[in-house]
Curated annotation (Swiss-Prot):
It comes from the Eukaryota. The gene is RPL16. Belongs to the universal ribosomal protein uL16 family. One of its GO terms (molecular function) is rRNA binding. The keyword Ribosomal protein applies. This is Large ribosomal subunit protein uL16m. Pfam families: Ribosomal_L16 (PF00252). It is found in: Mitochondrion.
Amino acid sequence: MLYPKRTKFRKYQKGRCKGCKADGTQLCFGKYGIKSCEAGRISYQAIEAARRAISRKFRRNSKIWVRVFADIPITSKPAEVRMGKGKGNTKGWIARVLKGQILFEMDCVSLSNAQQAATLAAHKLGLSIKFFKWS
């Protein structure tokens, strides 16, 4: 599971995901990539599920780079608890994703395999994504 060992604060405000990503929109490591087409939040479970789906498709002799990291804690209060009495406990971790941000990079695989893996990962992520290759 991908989440930080320690953070500056235990709990964060919700914040908003809006705008486009200025940097982190070009491929740095692999030949193929998965880019987000909209801004949103991705949980660490979704990132891990997408990574597993991609690696399961490729088997061996392939390289995958995860370019997002879930570093923001999400809190929630237990069921049937009255309002007030402070902010809830940490429930999980999310990554804020902006439009145009690269989520995954792949290398040492064929184009058709990479496209199929991107489709599998898209079902896990919950955001609209775009597959593209290095040019």
